[in-house]
Structure formats: structure tokens, C-alpha cells
Amino acid sequence: MTKKIKSIEVFREFVEAFRCPHCKGPFQVVDLKSLKCTKNHTFDFAKQGYVNLTTHSSKSLYDKKLFEARQRIIMESNLFALLHKKISKMINDHLDDFPRFPFLILDAGCGEGSHLHKVLDDCRNTAITGVGLDISKAGIVMAAKNYKEPIWLVGDLAKSPLKDQSFHVILNILSPSNYKEFKRILVPNGLVIKVVPRPNYLKELRETLFENTKKVIYKSSDTAELFKKHFKLKAVYNLCYTKKLNQAEQINLVQMSPLSWNSERTDIDSFINRASSEVTVDLDILIGLNVQ
């Protein structure tokens, strides 16, 4: 069985969790080649096994180079390993309260898929199936090439091709949210895990790149207040630690970060030319319940 066919078989098993982005009608998998809704809107599976469920083309500043750097930081440097272990424990503890399985977990804004892959690996729960959704085709192509277990979708979070009350958990890691859609697609008492940066997140990089200009300040409190308007806040966890990066890892950190987009070349060189450096990971993990 090819990788593409295996991916389509998994999609077919959970096809009832998805809907047509044009008409919101149900899908069926046709000839292990495409998705077709009741009004004959058709979407073909790509050779890597993902499917593009957007209704229009979109441009993204997040390109292949950025996603490759991000993958190396996550998978090789393990910069977020403590975060992944924390999230996986929350998921397993939460799913213990559900009498039925299988379980579907959505990573909303998954990028190249490494966060979802690591979380699922740490969960070690074969009853869980992951779905990664991102507007960036470059990210989803990379995810589908590297990680065969989850379902990968190019899709617009504002018009998500996901059915009502289909997902038990939504991950939203350092990515924009759409709480209205989150509430719609979560099962009752489903879990939202949102990760947001705190003031000291990557402070060493920010202090170098913005030494002579206004610094980027992260205020997680504003995000938490908005979050509480949509979900019952179950808990907030602060995760703060430092990790030493070598020069190659520093280059990856710069390449994966939008902070470098408007920075001076001299400031970027000042950071990446160091033999090594300590970087701070400072995050809030917001845990919300979809109470109805």
C-alpha cells in the first residue's frame, strides 16, 4: 500500500468529520482518489496524501525555508520538548473522561506538522487520530511528506472544512485563533489548548534584532481575557526555561521566526555569528472547556 493510499484510507475512516468548504455538504471518498460532496464539488488528493480544501488561492509569507528551519528546531533541537510533554499529558488526562473512542485532535495552524507529530508521539494513544490544518500549502506538503499518521489539510480556519462537534481536542500553538469556529467543531466539553508567548519568549533574539528600535512585547493577559469569553478557563500553565543553542541552531531560530522579517542584516548577523547562546522559552498554556 502506497503512502498516498494509506493516507486516503485514514481519511475515509473519518470522512464524516469533514464538510465541503463551498456548500457545507458531506463528503465521500471516491475511488481512493478524491473527495466529492453531494453537490459534486470535488477535491483531489495530492500524491503526498494531503488534500487542499481551500476555495481560493492565498499567499503566505511562511515559505518552505521557514518551515524547514522550524522543523529542525522542533525535531532536532527539541526546543519545545517540555511543551509537547505537558500538552500530551493534558490530552490523555482529558480523554479519560470520554467513554467512547476513537478521538480526533485538530492542530489549527499546524504549519509543517512537527508540533502535532511530537504531541501525538508523546500521547502514545492509538485511539487518537490527529488532523493538521493550515492555510499554507508549503507547510502541509512538508507535513504530509514527513509524517504519515495524521490527516493533513490545506484549509482556511475562517471557513474550516470541518463538521460541527467532530473534534475532542483543538491545539492552537503560537498561531492565530478563530474561537467561533473552535466552538462549532468541538464536541461538548471538548478541550482547547492554546499556547501563547509571554514577555520573555525568545527575549535574547528580540533584544538583538531590535536593539535600537521599539521591541516586540508579548502580552498574554489580553489573549487570556478574550479566551475566557468563549471557553470555560480550566487552567493556565506557565512554562519557562532556557536552552543552549549552537550556531547552526541559532541560524534555524532566526530563519523560522517572523521577528527577522523586518530586521537589519547587521542585527541578524550579530545573533547568528555567536558560537552559542541561551534562549528563553516563556509560554502560557491556556486550557479551556467547550461548555454548552
Where in this protein do the model-derived segments appear?
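Class I SAM-dependent methyltransferase Rossmann-like catalytic core
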Residues: I8, K59-K86
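Conserved Class I S-adenosyl-L-methionine
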Residues: F14-E16, L239-Q292
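Conserved alpha-helix/loop element of class I SAM-dependent methyltransferases that forms part
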Residues: N78-R100
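A short acidic, Gly/Pro-enriched loop at the edge of an enzyme's catalytic core
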Residues: A158-V169
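Helix-to-beta-strand junctions that scaffold the AdoMet/dcAdoMet cofactor pocket
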Residues: L186-V187
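Conserved beta-strand signature within the Rossmann-like core of class I S-adenosyl-L-methionine
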Residues: G190-P199
